[in-house]
Amino acid sequence: MQYQSTRDKNLKASSAQAILNGLAPDGGLYTMPSFDEVKFDYTTVLNMDTMSMSTKILSKLLPDFSEAEMAKLVHDGYTGKFETDHLTPTVPVGEDFILELFRGPTSAFKDVALSMLPRLMTASKEKLGVDDEIMILTATSGDTGKAAMEGFCDVPGTKIIVFYPHGGVSAVQQAQMATQAGENVCACAVRGNFDDAQTGVKKIFSAVSKDQLLEGKGVRLSSANSINIGRLAPQVVYYYRAYADLVQAGRIQPGDKVDYVVPTGNFGDILAGYFAKEMGLPVGKLVCASNANNVLTDFLRTGRYDRRRPFHKTVSPSMDILVSSNLERLLYLLSGDDKLIADLMKQLSENGEYEVPADMLEKLHELFWAGFCDDEGAKTAIGKVWKDDHYLCDTHTAVAWDVAQQYKQANPEHNAVVVLSTASPYKFPAAVLEGIGEKAEGDEFDVMEQLHKVTGVPVPKNLADLRSRAVRHRDVIDRGEMLDYVLGKAAAEK
């Protein structure tokens, strides 16, 4: 199976090439032409452990790697890094279920993919005979940055630069990045919001490709964002894991559909659910939960994408996004029309908006349901879930929980509902503490201790240790300086 660019299907790449390149030369995203070659009988994985399940699914999506090769990569990527061998447990909360994706080394769902991506990238280099150093460029709205830095820390032949919005991530998230060890890692704040950082990274890829700025320097660029298919593919697995958990617990029968509610910013996590559905998993509705930056809610309801709106800094900062990159993959897979996608993305870049054809909107309505929740709603949800079920959730999960209740009220005939929980509550302790009716006092680390004393919920060790770590990364730049910053780092390596 060859991957192809969403904007020009003649630009093809093997799965290993797509992983190494990150982004297609024309700025499009590498995507499979259809799901025909990756479909399989989901019942064959229901009784597998998570490692075996990951091996099976990833070797389907990334066919350059045999099952034996993938099994080793999975073992090396995950062993000893998560709180449980299960990696992503599913727990009942009230009448619904929460899929806990935050049990990894940085307490965020990105760990599932970013524990694997460095192994996939290194193996792709070997498979393709590439000797160049791989410089990873990543924009983060909070969680990807630390997870990527942790994953690539001191991996030979790689260097990673993470750009994050200055003042646009939580204090805990910033501390996680600023204190990251490793000789090959770098975090830099960008004056602006996440969309500025993400657009800047895309422009760097385009400029380097067009003007051959790294030609002959022994360095090539790639990405650890979910625009990289190697980042997206591992996220498909936990949809199967949750389904298998519900079957094994006797909560559903094989063949029953499950509705998944996903806190959504860049559209990667929920797109992985769409991949799982098209590969054959009995997925009912995919519910897209947004915060006050509800551009996706409006789009999935009306078919009109319009980023020309106020940008809100919220208590769920990883979702503070107005340009959702992975949506491009979905639109391509629904239409198969690369010229249409290229035109829509051009309209978005030049005019700030686009509208999809009526037949595509109809398909979107069949697949997705969308809702949003503001900060007050999220804090209320945190308090209610804690009071009713003694379960402590973070702000992003709270957004999804609130939208899940909206969805159930609007759709009384819904299936079993699984809410994806994307981060530990201790990454956003002040808002969580306020949600359970307590006043936050002191800095974020004081508040973390306060939250623990009030709830008794253990603080993940990687977060508890943050306060004592030395700050190593302090750079702050304007968005127009990003290219020069990267070229300077590349030159410094030689």
Language model segments and positions:
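PLP-dependent amino-acid enzyme catalytic core
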Residues: M1-K494
